[in-house]
């Protein structure tokens, strides 16, 4: 198993015999409680036989600081994952079996271990899969055309929760693109072409950003007192972002001391979307 001194960098492995949406949603919701952690999500969906599972376990051995979250219906698929985690002394979370066991003990019924039984394969389900793929494809302004196709566009300086928010909202069937804001850099013309209502400007308190960025530098073993983490630089970034938000006439949210869920709820309310409808 690969090792690293940087305990703030975490690789969350999601293994599922279906799409893995439930496991992914659990992972992102839990990870939102650790804003200073740099988290890489590695999804392995539709792992339906032992051969595929063995390939996954061999591949993830190279990653450091692992947490495995799995949703596997069949016992024969669960056991190798649990054994792998035990042998490598890593944390492993089964999000499916405890619920099945609780229902079984209460009803005295035997589960049929049918893969995918929990999903209704309707259009809403497939839309959510598509939204997840969209969020990954258009993260960090990778392709400006995504702004025109998105339901929501998130703008914000570094460390304002753009990516976790994108993924959280994608799980609500929303296509989300985001753009990091850096002073004196070009803003894609597409940003000015879209409806301002679907643009969300994210900001933060300078002191909160300062602490987050300092901790990020420390996590990388670097000097925390850099231009990136200086109050002067942070204030300039926030002022530049605020000027853009005013120019666009977009909705602005301060994410300081707010969870991902709280910020997402404000966005859904602004868009007139009932959370439960998604």
UniProtKB/Swiss-Prot annotation:
It comes from the Bacteria. ADP binds at residues 156-163. One of its GO terms (molecular function) is protein serine/threonine kinase activity. InterPro entries: Kinase-pyrophosphorylase (IPR005177), P-loop_NTPase (IPR027417), PPDK_reg (IPR026565). It holds the Pfam family Kinase-PPPase. Transmembrane segments: none annotated. It catalyses: N(tele)-phospho-L-histidyl/L-threonyl-[pyruvate, phosphate dikinase] + ADP = N(tele)-phospho-L-histidyl/O-phospho-L-threonyl-[pyruvate, phosphate dikinase] + AMP + H(+); N(tele)-phospho-L-histidyl/O-phospho-L-threonyl-[pyruvate, phosphate dikinase] + phosphate + H(+) = N(tele)-phospho-L-histidyl/L-threonyl-[pyruvate, phosphate dikinase] + diphosphate. The keyword Kinase applies. Keywords: Kinase, Nucleotide-binding, Serine/threonine-protein kinase, Transferase. Bifunctional serine/threonine kinase and phosphorylase involved in the regulation of the pyruvate, phosphate dikinase (PPDK) by catalyzing its phosphorylation/dephosphorylation. PANTHER family: PYRUVATE, PHOSPHATE DIKINASE REGULATORY PROTEIN 1, CHLOROPLASTIC. Belongs to the pyruvate, phosphate/water dikinase regulatory protein family. PDRP subfamily. This is Putative pyruvate, phosphate dikinase regulatory protein. It comes from Lactobacillus acidophilus (strain ATCC 700396 / NCK56 / N2 / NCFM). The lineage of its organism: Bacteria, Bacillati, Bacillota, Bacilli, Lactobacillales.
């Amino acid at each position: 198993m690969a090792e690293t001194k940087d305990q703030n960098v975490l690789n969350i492995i999601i293994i599922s015999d279906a799409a893995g949406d439930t496991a992914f949603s659990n992972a992102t919701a839990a990870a939102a409680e650790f804003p200073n952690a740099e988290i890489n999500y590695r999804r392995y969906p539709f792992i339906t036989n032992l051969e595929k599972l063995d390939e996954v376990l061999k591949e993830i051995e190279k990653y450091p600081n692992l947490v495995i979250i799995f949703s596997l219906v069949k016992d024969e698929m669960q056991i190798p994952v649990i054994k792998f985690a035990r042998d490598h002394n890593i944390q492993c979370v089964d999000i499916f079996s405890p619920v099945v066991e609780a229902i079984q003990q209460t009803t005295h019924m035997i589960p049929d271990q049918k893969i995918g039984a929990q999903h209704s394969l309707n259009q809403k389900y497939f839309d959510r899969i598509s939204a997840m793929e969209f969020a990954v494809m258009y993260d960090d302004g990778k392709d400006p055309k995504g702004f025109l196709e998105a339901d929501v566009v998130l703008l914000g300086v570094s460390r304002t929760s753009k990516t976790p928010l994108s993924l959280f909202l994608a799980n609500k069937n929303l296509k989300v693109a985001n753009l990091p804001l850096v002073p004196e850099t070009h803003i894609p013309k597409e940003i000015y072409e879209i409806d301002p209502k679907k643009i969300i400007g994210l900001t933060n308190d300078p002191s909160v950003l300062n602490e987050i960025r300092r901790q990020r530098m420390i996590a990388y073993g670097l000097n925390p007192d850099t231009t990136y983490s200086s109050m002067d630089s942070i204030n300039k970034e926030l002022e530049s972002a605020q000027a853009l938000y005013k120019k666009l006439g977009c909705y602005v949210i301060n994410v300081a001391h707010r969870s991902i869920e709280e910020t997402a709820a404000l966005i859904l309310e602004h868009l007139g979307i009932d959370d439960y409808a998604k």
